[in-house]
Each structure stands twice: as structure tokens, then as C-alpha cells.
């Protein structure tokens, strides 16, 4: 299957302008092929994009004497240790009588043995012995006796698996560059969401963050006045573009730098207020309390004037602020890079992986980063903050026949356009 490596950059302004305001909802029959509408949504596979590398499991979770079962893109896989100790993957179902290999044992180095009749496979899926029939079994070498093997690669302690039918693409195309950088410290964790991968990934860069995350520790410690402006924005938000046919990024990441005032630039973010008045609600204010307003002012001042100036950590435009195929969202905090990758499990569930990347210069700094991640950051960002996303996304009804978009939905809609027209294995009508 052809791999689109050099798709020309394409502006997504059309997808953004196709997202009408709430006062002017889209019209037409469900399934009409309009940018960002159900026509695009219906072209995105429910079980995921097959021709890609996906994060699958932390290497430390795979023991040496047994396999671990994991469902990915609707396929049952078994992960176990190969002959060199690295993690490998086969189809979980024994081709003999469809027993689960994950319930077997690794009796011999680099192999896994079926618990039913003792059929033993190596890391390439080749049937090497049939313990139930004995050493002279004629089953070995028979056509169809081997199990399907899935290519794997372990990077920074995380196992990635190729789920495609074609020869694997270069893993560097699908996995963030820090996984190949010896200087980078990449800490990761994962959760299982009871949601299809599409809404799990589309839960980014729209107006939900201001409301859903308003009481998260992450937002409370930020310049929330700036976040108010940033997360409410529709047409004022910077336009996006497609880079190398693989990534949807913002054209102007300087917009997201809340430290502009340190360099003498008076920004709209600096003038924003966290609390707003809603005339249609009788001039009610939200957030409701003055305490939140004052907290926003204090945190805004501290972050704009006391936080040291830092450079962006990501210099590769393809992997800058935005989303990268197949399912990796990126945000550069300048102290670290936050990434969230979604691996489809089945039609109803997804694995969500979180990456925290930093570049500590000393052993002590690396030790501190690991400790901070273990006792604080992982909870703050991936449970307290993203747990709010999880709670909302799990109750969505994604397949309803109608969606009424707002201009602030431009980024998720542009991602649909990226997948439908640029991803490997998705047919263009």
C-alpha cells in the first residue's frame, strides 16, 4: 500500500470556515460530504488507521515467563519476550484450535507455548514444536500452522507495534522525535478510556477546556485570563496548516507564548479578563465568584512577569503544537513537552498514552524529574486534568446523525480533514 510521505502542505482555512457559528448551524442531510461534516467523519475507520505504528504497552509490564494479552485496533495480540529479551507480538489466537496464547507460558527462550495442545511459536510466529503430538509431529511446517507476527520496536521503555498489512513505514514518521534522542527524558503512563478513539482524539484545542477544566489544578495554576481568551477563540485563533501530509499545526505558535509582555509586547492575552458577563442570562457572570477573578489576575501577573523566559523545546515544525498522524497531540510548555497519543482498542474503548518530555542536564535533574512525575505531575496532568476529559468523552454519543458546529470547533474538524485526505489506508472518494 502506498505511503503518502510528501503530500503537499495544505491550509486548513477551508475546514475552519466550514465550521459555522452556533447561530448558523449546518444544514443538509446527514452524511453530506461537506468539509468537517459527517461526510468526513464517516470516512474515518471506527477501529482506527491500520497503516501506522502505535504505542502498545510499557516494556516493564511484559514478564519473562508468560505473555500479556492486549487488544489493539480490534485485534487480539500477545506480547512476550523474544530471544534477545526485547518485547515481540503475535496474534493471540493459536492457528491450531484458536486457544489464547496469552494463557500459555514461555517455556523456552524466545517462544510462547499454547496452553491447549502445546504448540510452540517463536518471535516470528513460526511453529517450532507441537508438544502435545511429540517431537515427530507432522504439523510443524504445515501451511497455515504459523501465527501472524506484528513488528515491534521498544523506545524509551515503551513498545510500539505496526498494525498495517503492508511493510512497516519508517517508525520515525509516526513517533515523536524525542523517542530517538538520547538526551531526552521521556516519562510515560497510560489509561483505558471507555470511548472510541475518534472522540478521544477530537477532545482537543476547542472551547471545552475553559469549562471542563476550570477547576483542575493545571488551569488554576495557569494564566487563566490568557486561557480564557485562548480557549474561547473561534475565528480569531491562528489558522492551521498541514505539514508533510502528516501533521496539523498552528501557523503561529507565538500566539501561545504567554511571556510576550516580558519582551515589551502588549498582547490581547494580557488585557483579557477571566470572568465574563452574559447578557442573555440577565448579565450573570461566569465564573461566578470574585475569588476566581482575583486568582486569575494574580496568577496571570506571576506567570507573565516572574516566570523566567524560555525557548521552545520543539524546533521541528511537523512535531510542534498540534496533532500528528495517527493520533498524537502535542503541546510545548517550554519546560517540557506534553503529548497524548490514542491507540484504538475496539469500537468502544481506547488506550490513551501520555508522554512527558524534558531535557535535564544533570543526573540530579533527571532524578528530580522522575520523582516529580511519579508523585505529582502524572496525577496533576493525566488524572486530575485529563481525567476530566475522560469523564466527558466517555458519555458522548459520537454516532448521532447530526452535529451543529461552532467556529471554535475548527481544529477538530481540520483534524478530520487531515485523516480523511492524508492518512495511509483511508480511501479518498
Residue ranges and their predicted role:
Residues 50, 146, 153-155, 336, ...:
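A short, structural micro-pattern
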Amino acid at each position: 500500500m502506498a505511503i503518502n510521505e510528501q503530500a503537499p502542505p495544505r491550509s486548513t482555512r477551508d475546514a475552519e470556515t466550514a465550521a459555522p457559528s452556533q447561530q448558523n448551524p449546518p444544514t443538509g442531510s446527514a452524511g453530506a460530504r461537506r468539509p468537517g461534516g459527517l461526510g468526513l467523519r464517516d470516512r474515518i475507520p471506527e477501529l482506527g488507521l491500520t497503516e501506522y505504528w502505535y504505542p502498545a504497552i510499557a516494556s516493564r509490564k511484559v514478564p519473562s515467563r508468560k505473555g500479556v494479552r492486549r487488544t489493539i485496533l480490534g485485534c487480539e495480540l500477545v506480547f512476550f519476550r523474544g530471544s534477545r529479551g526485547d518485547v515481540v507480538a503475535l496474534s493471540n489466537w493459536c492457528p491450531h484450535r484458536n486457544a489464547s496464547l496469552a494463557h500459555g507460558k514461555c517455556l523456552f527462550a524466545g517462544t510462547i507455548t499454547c496452553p491447549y495442545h502445546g504448540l510452540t511459536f517463536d518471535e516470528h510466529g513460526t511453529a517450532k514444536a507441537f508438544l502435545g503430538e511429540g517431537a515427530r509431529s507432522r504439523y510443524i511446517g504445515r501451511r497455515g500452522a504459523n501465527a501472524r507476527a506484528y513488528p515491534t520496536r521498544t523506545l524509551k521503555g515503551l513498545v510500539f507495534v505496526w498494525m498495517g498489512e503492508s511493510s512497516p513505514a519508517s517508525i520515525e514518521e509516526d513517533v515523536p522525535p524525542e523517542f530517538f534522542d538520547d538526551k531526552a527524558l521521556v516519562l510515560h503512563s497510560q489509561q483505558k478510556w471507555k470511548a472510541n478513539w475518534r472522540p478521544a482524539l477530537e477532545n482537543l484545542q476547542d472551547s471545552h477546556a475553559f469549562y471542563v477544566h476550570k477547576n483542575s489544578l493545571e488551569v488554576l495554576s495557569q494564566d487563566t485570563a490568557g486561557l480564557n481568551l485562548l480557549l474561547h477563540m473561534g475565528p480569531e485563533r491562528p489558522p492551521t496548516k498541514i505539514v508533510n501530509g502528516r501533521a496539523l499545526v498552528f501557523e503561529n505558535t507565538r500566539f501561545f507564548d504567554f511571556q510576550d509582555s516580558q519582551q515589551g509586547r502588549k498582547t490581547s492575552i494580557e488585557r483579557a479578563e477571566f470572568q465574563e458577563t452574559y447578557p442573555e442570562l440577565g448579565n450573570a457572570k461566569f465564573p461566578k465568584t470574585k475569588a476566581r477573578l482575583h486568582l486569575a489576575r494574580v496568577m496571570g501577573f506571576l506567570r507573565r512577569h516572574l516566570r523566567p523566559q524560555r525557548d521552545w523545546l520543539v524546533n521541528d515544525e511537523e512535531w510542534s503544537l498540534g496533532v500528528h498522524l495517527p493520533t498524537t497531540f502535542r503541546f510545548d510548555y517550554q519546560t517540557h513537552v506534553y503529548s497524548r497519543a490514542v491507540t484504538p482498542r475496539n469500537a468502544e474503548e481506547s488506550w490513551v498514552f501520555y508522554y512527558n518530555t524534558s531535557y535535564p542536564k544533570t543526573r540530579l535533574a533527571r532524578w528530580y524529574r522522575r520523582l516529580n512525575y511519579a508523585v505529582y505531575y502524572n496525577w496533576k496532568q493525566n488524572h486530575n486534568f485529563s481525567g476530566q476529559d475522560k469523564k466527558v468523552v466517555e458519555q458522548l454519543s459520537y454516532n448521532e446523525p447530526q452535529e451543529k458546529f461552532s467556529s471554535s470547533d475548527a481544529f477538530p474538524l481540520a483534524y478530520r480533514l487531515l485523516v480523511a485526505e492524508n492518512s495511509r489506508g483511508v480511501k479518498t472518494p
